[in-house]
């Protein structure tokens, strides 16, 4: 069984990834504020071991406001206001999962610790500038992460919200994994079909049908 050290270690030896990390380092060194902090960039892999992954939720790039991003897609630190997309995720959960109570914070570590890989496809961003690090090579790295999960694991659930995530997920073998798609939970698109998608109960039904412990979504 592979682990993240194998996957990330192999990629870190590649020139493209060394270039990515160098570009981020140079941006920080030049005085730019880059999110998340250096020690949090790879948190998705720290909280969810390769062999423990049950569900993959793909985000795009980190939140670009102060004190928000901490390396898990959609998640924010406990003391920070819940961002609109995450609020809509919670709204769907209240409709989808019996007994789910609207959380008071957006800190999703509890999901990560249960096997929900909260993976942004770009792992850094400059303060106040969405998608500013979109062309640094992160996409190639996260494509590799998805490919390795697809190949070396089975019976995973991939939640792909919005066209960006769905494009990233085209390679996933749908005979071995469950792939659920919906519009992005952003206020701009949630009403086009994210609300009512019931992805959280569908995820748990699939896991349980394969003898895998379901996710407790309550935060």
Swiss-Prot record:
Coiled coil: none
UniProt GO molecular function: uracil DNA N-glycosylase activity
Residues of the active site: 61 (proton acceptor)
Catalysed reactions, as listed in the record: Hydrolyzes single-stranded DNA or mismatched double-stranded DNA and polynucleotides, releasing free uracil
Subcellular location: Cytoplasm
EC number: 3.2.2.27
Major location (coarse): cytoplasm
CDD domains listed in its UniProt record: UDG-F1-like (cd10027)
Pfam family, one: UDG
Family: Belongs to the uracil-DNA glycosylase (UDG) superfamily. UNG family.
Protein name: Uracil-DNA glycosylase
Species whose genome carries this gene: Haemophilus influenzae (strain ATCC 51907 / DSM 11121 / KW20 / Rd)
